[in-house]
A protein has these predicted regions:
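Catalytic-site beta-strand/loop segments enriched in glycine and acidic/polar residues
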Residues: 12, 18
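Active-site-proximal binding-pocket segments
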Residues: 16, 23, 48
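Short, charged, low-complexity loops and linkers
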Residues: 1, 28-30, 95-97
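Acidic/histidine-rich alpha-helical segments that form the ligand environment
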Residues: 8, 73-128
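Short, contiguous alpha-helical
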Residues: 27-79, 120-168
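Short helix-to-loop capping/linker segments positioned immediately adjacent to catalytic or ligand/cofactor-binding
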Residues: 23-26, 102
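Extreme N-terminal tail/first-helix region
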Residues: 1-11
Length: 168
């Protein structure tokens, strides 16, 4: 597994280790609980994996184009500087649907492995150029996708740790 994704996997496992049923469902009013956060992460990994798998099956990357200025700025902030903005609304395809915590965790870990393989396969086929476009960050290399998911995951792992340590 790629080093960024392996580190992400370890951090998710550590942040969710020992969570009881009540811990999985704890959240401040109007915010996602731990189960929803982990489900969201799993859906984001699964969506990236599926995009890569479909492109590989079709024999070409999903989108090769020059990035727009706004996409470049967002990608530099997130991927290069590790700054993930707060309050960005998740797209519908990665919004949690209500899986329980252990189920969401198992799915997230499996999706992370699937995404790692799909990104490695795409990188092997298309090299170090763009392998697909993120809806807000534009065209990205496999390395940028991995770093994006690491930064995005760390953003949410912080929330997992806050909720797990707050007895409410």
């Amino acid at each position: 597994m790629d080093a960024w994704l392996e580190r992400l996997q370890r951090e998710i496992a550590a942040a969710t280790a020992g969570l009881k049923d009540t811990d999985w469902h704890r959240a401040p009013q109007g915010h996602w609980n731990c189960a929803q956060i982990v489900e969201h992460l799993g859906r984001s990994y699964g969506t990236t994996a599926k995009m890569m798998e479909l492109a590989l099956a079709a024999g070409q990357p999903p989108e090769r184009r020059a990035p727009k200025f706004k996409e470049t700025i967002a990608r530099v902030l997130i991927v290069n500087l590790g700054i993930f903005p707060r309050g960005v609304k998740a797209p519908a395809m990665v919004v949690p649907s209500g899986n329980d915590g252990p189920e969401a965790l198992a799915h997230a870990m499996e999706s992370l492995k699937r995404m790692d393989k799909a990104l490695a396969d795409a990188e092997e086929r298309w090299g170090s150029g763009s392998v697909g476009a993120h809806f807000r960050l534009g065209p990205m290399t496999a390395a940028e996708w991995r770093k994006f998911h690491f930064v995005h995951g760390r953003h949410h792992i912080r929330h997992l740790r806050e909720r797990a340590s707050d007895p409410q």
